[in-house]
A protein has these predicted regions:
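N-terminal pre-domain/capping segments
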Residues: 1-97
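Active-site acidic/histidine proton-transfer and metal-coordination neighborhood
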Residues: 75-151
């Protein structure tokens, strides 16, 4: 049986610090790796430097949520937002390649019904087709109806 390894989710831990500061804090706290939700406001070269200096890997990142002020929490299952979803997927893959993240959570968003499911499946196929050449795994995160209705 292998050793247990712990990853710090920097979307929840050390949120008062910059993302790079949180990476160093995770190292000091004894974590083995890090992950984060939305790193896009930080220069990926700065993240790469912090990861190299801490000997960490970035487990994964999420695609952008869309218009947070309008209540969006993902774009990939939103009919009519396919162009925006593909842009978010492409951005996440480009960013992940720079920081060497191996997983991307493609955020569905708040939607329901057959059309939303079909749009989500098409966007997931799009993401997989682009990620496979870079050895990046595409993830989904099913959420429960209580915490995130129609996600």
């Amino acid at each position: 049986m292998g050793l247990i390894k712990f990853s710090a989710n920097l979307g929840f831990l050390w949120s008062e610090l910059t993302l790079t500061g949180a990476i160093y804090a995770a190292k000091e706290a004894g974590f083995d790796a890090v992950e984060c939700h939305w790193p896009y406001e930080t220069n990926p070269k700065d993240i790469s430097k912090a990861l190299l200096e801490t000997d960490f890997i970035m487990i994964g990142i999420n695609t952008r949520r869309g218009d947070v002020d309008a209540g969006e929490n993902g774009l990939s299952a939103l009919p009519g937002r396919e162009k925006d979803a593909k842009k978010a997927i492409d951005e996440a893959i480009s960013y992940a390649r720079i920081i060497k993240a191996k997983n991307i959570h493609v955020m569905a968003g708040f939607s329901y019904g057959d059309k939303a499911r079909d749009v989500f499946i098409r966007n997931l196929k799009y993401a997989c087709d682009r990620a496979i050449d870079h050895d990046i795994t595409i993830l989904i995160e099913p959420l429960n109806e209580y915490d995130a209705p129609v996600y």
